[in-house]
């Protein structure tokens, strides 16, 4: 099964010849190498680029071990450049080369060379590769498969069934290829323990790995919940686990984020137009990895749907925060009181902004009021949207608030502008 990944291919195409090193980043096993060496390579060939003008180097291949030497690699590349036509250089797992920054910097000085690299492992995660090229690197971040990408490749399968699979096993390309649910689950659990967490432990010399594992379980169990290191430290104590300081927890959370396992969403005071430093929320980059950490015992569709909406927004290149709105209400004694209510997502991209609520169902008037109350009290005219699980016809209420179904939101790239 081939996933076309057209969004990322189009990104690579639009960034061609920009005199920068294109750095393809993302969680391990998200398909970075396939994107570059198969899909983008095919695009170049289909558009008339000769094979001998595409230089590919997979540094994780034992046969290419000599090319891990920077001078040998540079000489190899220069030896393949025979004319003044454009050459495309693609290097996979660039961190395996010593002094690779110098090599790529040398390539930047050659006018007819366009360079693309990937890099990720325990000693040099892809977030670090991008850091090395601040000012000279052009990041193209690859996420796990989106729901629409999966549906495109499996158009003969019922959408609701695919949603159940996606919600449970996520969107890592290899996971989709397995036929049985047991194979998917076993793969994810093994990948989490033997690749992602092992990378973090080796990279940061973590000896007491049980605490790291336990922290990830707590974060996985509480996706979409407001938290901070001190709260998580208290959770360790209350659950009878060993004491873990807030500072250590903060470090571990940073490690998870650096490895692209989780994303942190800051709180934003909508009326005050300022960020609130704590608490904040975490969402898993891949739902399958989240569920694997909990041994597939905590499949809560409400929270997983919220996480899926967050991931979709991030994939569409939006900046996503958690919103807070202060409102004045009357209490049971008719006294005026201030309350803070939450907007699930404050979504920004350039001059665009959207406010989005994830609501599994609007099953009663009270539930509808609960979801609309924060949106009604936002003092601006940016679009306000509620996403529900049911596949409904899009509708607008008297306040201009749009309610749409999850399927429409996930499947239509322009759903926020309908």
Predicted regions and their residues:
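Conserved catalytic segments around the Walker B and adjacent sensor/switch elements
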Residues: 45-61
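A cross-kingdom feature that marks ATP-driven nucleic-acid transaction machinery
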Residues: 2, 34, 41, 49, ...
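Interdomain hinge/linker elements that couple catalytic modules in large macromolecular machines
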Residues: 2, 143-144, 148-326
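Hydrophobic anchor at the beta1->P-loop junction of P-loop NTPases
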Residues: 24
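Pre-Walker A adenine-sensing motif
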Residues: 2-17
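Short glycine-rich substrate-engagement loop in P-loop NTPases that contacts/grips substrate
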Residues: 56-84
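Structural recognition of the conserved hydrophobic beta-strand(s) that form the central parallel beta-sheet
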Residues: 114-120, 141
